[in-house]
Design a protein with these regions (language model features):
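Long, contiguous binding/interaction regions
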Residues: 20-157
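N-terminal amphipathic/basic-hydrophobic helices that include classical n-h-c signal peptides
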Residues: 1-26
């Protein structure tokens, strides 16, 4: 069951991933790729560091086996993100636990599936935890050219 709505006006074509283990094409509900962008201000950096460490330590273990990557803490604006943030890559089956940790931290976050439509991912398909922030949509990839796909689970740049 996907937790993010697809708008009635527009359908987003599901992304086909290559399985990490056996090379077969893969796109199931439990393996659907997600990103969380977790934002912080300088006064919240210690809280962000604790959450970053907690996610890093849990990565690949137990209920967090589907958390594949915890990115660097970026202390400045990067891409469409207007303030410091770090990124977490995970499969949908980790979504409830990742959301619980983020909510408990009190930090704002943008959580979205990863499809071939970067704009939809960051707008109509996303969910905000905390106060939404204005994103710079002009730097997002055009539909069908999402660069986030190639770096999923590997890199945040």
């Amino acid at each position: 069951m996907l937790l993010f709505p697809v708008t009635a006006q527009r359908r987003v074509r599901p992304l086909k991933l290559r399985a990490i283990y056996d090379g077969e094409a893969l796109m199931t509900t439990k393996s659907a790729p997600y990103h969380a962008h977790i934002y912080y201000e300088s006064q919240d950096r210690v809280t962000a560091e604790h959450l970053h460490q907690e996610l890093s330590n849990a990565q690949g273990v137990g209920h967090f086996v589907s958390v594949l990557f915890v990115g660097e803490m970026r202390d400045k604006k990067v891409g469409p993100h207007p303030k410091p943030q770090f990124e977490v890559h995970f499969h949908e089956d980790a979504l409830p636990r990742v959301l619980t940790l983020i909510k408990a931290s009190g930090l704002a976050a943008l959580v979205h599936p990863l499809t071939d439509d970067d704009l939809a991912d960051h707008t109509s398909l996303s969910v905000w935890i905390g106060e939404p922030l204005p994103l710079d949509h002009s730097v997002l990839d055009p539909p069908g050219m999402n660069q986030g796909i190639a770096r999923f689970g590997k890199s945040d740049v």
